[in-house]
């Protein structure tokens, strides 16, 4: 077993899973090729996974560079330190911002214009929200602060959330 081969296998399995989740959740998705070539939310998540891997390995400059290009190409800004679960779907993602200490659980759906932002400037502190599994965040919502949004919660479009949300 070569470590790189193992990592590459896991990476492609996650990509397959991400594609499948989009096909299941978006009636406009016609095929795998459609998702791979024309879904900026998918591109942003794949680029984030690369950036996060670099960030976690101490290659912060490379992580920031990948993140910067991801934002330029997709209009979606995900800090390389953010943790993104599996089968996360960013739909119509233009303007999405996900901060450094944010965590997005498995199976979440995030629509355009969403901010998972911080409310403090303290380095090393948990400044951004944690979304549980299966959370849906509607277009334009702002979720601000280092608190938890429970599994399966639904946050309405244009909501401003500054306190924990129960499951």
Predicted regions and their residues:
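Terminal amphipathic alpha-helical/low-complexity segments used for targeting or macromolecular assembly
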Residues: 1-74
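Left-handed beta-helix
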Residues: 74, 79-80, 85-86, 91-100, ...
């Amino acid at each position: 077993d070569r470590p790189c081969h193992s990592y590459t296998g896991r990476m492609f399995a996650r990509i397959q899973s991400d594609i499948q989740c989009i096909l299941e959740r978006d009636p406009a998705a016609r095929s795998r090729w459609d998702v791979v070539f024309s879904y900026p939310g998918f591109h942003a998540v794949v680029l984030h996974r690369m950036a996060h891997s670099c960030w976690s390995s101490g290659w912060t400059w490379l992580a920031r560079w990948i993140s910067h290009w991801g934002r330029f190409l997709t209009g979606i800004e995900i800090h390389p330190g953010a943790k993104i679960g599996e089968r996360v779907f960013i739909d119509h993602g233009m303007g999405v911002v996900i901060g450094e200490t944010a965590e997005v659980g498995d199976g979440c759906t995030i629509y355009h214009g969403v901010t998972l932002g911080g409310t403090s400037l303290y380095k090393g502190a948990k400044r951004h929200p944690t979304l549980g599994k299966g959370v849906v965040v509607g277009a334009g919502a702002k979720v601000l602060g280092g608190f938890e949004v429970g599994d399966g919660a639904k946050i309405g479009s244009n909501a401003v959330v500054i306190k924990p949300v129960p499951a």
